[in-house]
């Protein structure tokens, strides 16, 4: 099972994002396939936060449009909701310590711990996730 990062959703959603069409095609292929995939509420809320942020996009997406897109994914029959389990906090704190994660790297460590604990492959456009020991990750186009 794969778990998809915020950036992949943003690039697939926003027509003005870099490589939008390639990401949109990748996501459509995933959704149209028979493959199960995971999604975390933190990823979906992060997606809504980013695409509706006026300092990031001009014009920003409407909340309704962003939530509608997120709901299509979240409610998909092959989408499994991935949530922190009993080992998550220990994995998260280990990753924070090992990488000296501070500031904006802290949520990355949180998501890396979520993928690690759940045994999913993390799909992201951010190659910086390579810093997290034990995380299975790949770029969607690799």
Predicted features and spans:
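Short, well-structured N-terminal submotif of metal-dependent ribonuclease cores
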Residues: 1-39, 54-68
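Active-site neighborhoods of divalent-metal-dependent phosphate/nucleic-acid chemistry enzymes
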Residues: 60, 78-123
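Short beta-strand segments at enzyme active-site cores
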Residues: 38-41, 82, 124-125
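Short, hinge-like loop/turn segments at secondary-structure boundaries
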Residues: 54-57, 99-100, 139-142
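Acidic, PIN/NYN-like endoribonuclease modules and their adjacent C-terminal/linker elements
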Residues: 1, 112-142
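Generic structural signal for secondary-structure transition and capping sites
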Residues: 18, 32-35, 56, 75-79, ...
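Alpha-helix capping/helix-boundary segments
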Residues: 8, 43, 87-88, 110-111, ...
